[in-house]
């Protein structure tokens, strides 16, 4: 990431319709689904009702076989099967950590792969999903940043990660039962996987609106957290159009250090970022912003850093998540000593901010924060190759 990078990255997103193939309904907005049904011959007067019926099959019951959508006529189901598909990304491999964390390697159109992580806890289940193949930000402490950006994910590929996890966890509502028939295993979504979500804003927005829709997956916006490295111009739009919880990959208290750790800081330095964050809780009706802070030995973990951090965020409803650095092969940093992390947390706590220390999860399967990178990373492809695969 350089200081001259554009706000909207020049990265292709695969179309929902592959060459000479059917339209994939997964990822279409309600309006998009209705329009697709009308184009396929559904009378306009029936389109709203049909949209609602299909929506509930797809996103409440997890049924993607049109023949099983039994409240639709046989002829209508046959038309759907001839015209559309309802496909989610393919799970290539599934690893389960000793602590119960699950990591999925997922294949999408073009043969590219991303990673998805499910973290079970006593009172919640958090699904960490990706928004891009690779990443453009090159944050020096993050393994994902060493995998070059290939492309944005479509809305279908983003919400599809949620759906495949629910498949694996057997979380869908059985036909004939209410939406509260089963305990919710995926209770929270965090956009903290591969990629910068705000460089793929429209697709992330559409996918999260599907996740929040009350007739489908029905997650509260308070249970969805979008993590950004600080794409300042998109922060207000996130509050207005998504309204989810916001986390910021902060990681440093001076521009000199943050320029090295999070190079996007060269374009939007700390002062500009904090200015953009001050209005977010009010506009989005969120309780507070989460500041993520990775603890790097002798880099950003001094008492002076802790005191500066408290001063910087003064006046912003916030909590600070302290993240012990999760090492990966070739990493240029070390994790701060535990005593140092606790001392740092104590300074923040005494200043009146919650400062939980994140327990590393899934380290044995490289599923912890900052460790994600496609294990079978493909050879980099040229734009011409990507366009050819997409039928552009």
Curated annotation (Swiss-Prot):
Intrachain disulfide bonds: 128-369
Cofactor(s) annotated in UniProt: [4Fe-4S] cluster
Record keywords, A-Z: 4Fe-4S, Cytoplasm, Disulfide bond, Iron, Iron-sulfur, Metal-binding, Methyltransferase, rRNA processing, S-adenosyl-L-methionine, Transferase, tRNA processing
Record InterPro entries: Aldolase_TIM (IPR013785), Methyltransferase_A (IPR040072), RlmN_N (IPR048641), RNA_MTrfase_RlmN (IPR027492), rRNA_lsu_MTrfase_RlmN/Cfr (IPR004383), rSAM (IPR007197)
Binding residue positions for [4Fe-4S] cluster: 135, 139, 142
Gene3D superfamilies per the UniProt record, alphabetical: 1.10.150.530, Aldolase class I
Principal location: cytoplasm
Cofactor note text: Binds 1 [4Fe-4S] cluster. The cluster is coordinated with 3 cysteines and an exchangeable S-adenosyl-L-methionine.
EC numbers, comma separated: 2.1.1.192
Top EC category: transferase
BP terms from Gene Ontology: rRNA base methylation; tRNA methylation
Catalytic reaction equation(s): adenosine(2503) in 23S rRNA + 2 reduced [2Fe-2S]-[ferredoxin] + 2 S-adenosyl-L-methionine = 2-methyladenosine(2503) in 23S rRNA + 5'-deoxyadenosine + L-methionine + 2 oxidized [2Fe-2S]-[ferredoxin] + S-adenosyl-L-homocysteine; adenosine(37) in tRNA + 2 reduced [2Fe-2S]-[ferredoxin] + 2 S-adenosyl-L-methionine = 2-methyladenosine(37) in tRNA + 5'-deoxyadenosine + L-methionine + 2 oxidized [2Fe-2S]-[ferredoxin] + S-adenosyl-L-homocysteine
Pfam families the record matches: Radical_SAM (PF04055), RlmN_N (PF21016)
Gene Ontology cellular component terms for the protein in this record: cytoplasm
Gene Ontology molecular function terms on file: 4 iron, 4 sulfur cluster binding; metal ion binding; rRNA (adenine(2503)-C2-)-methyltransferase activity; rRNA binding; tRNA (adenine(37)-C2)-methyltransferase activity; tRNA binding
Sequence ranges assigned to domain Radical SAM core in this UniProt record: 121-358
Entry's localization field: Cytoplasm
Membrane-crossing segments per the record: none
Its job: Specifically methylates position 2 of adenine 2503 in 23S rRNA and position 2 of adenine 37 in tRNAs. m2A2503 modification seems to play a crucial role in the proofreading step occurring at the peptidyl transferase center and thus would serve to optimize ribosomal fidelity.
NCBIfam families: rRNA_mod_RlmN (TIGR00048)
Family recorded in the similarity comment: Belongs to the radical SAM superfamily. RlmN family.
Protein name in UniProt: Dual-specificity RNA methyltransferase RlmN
Gene, per the UniProt record: rlmN
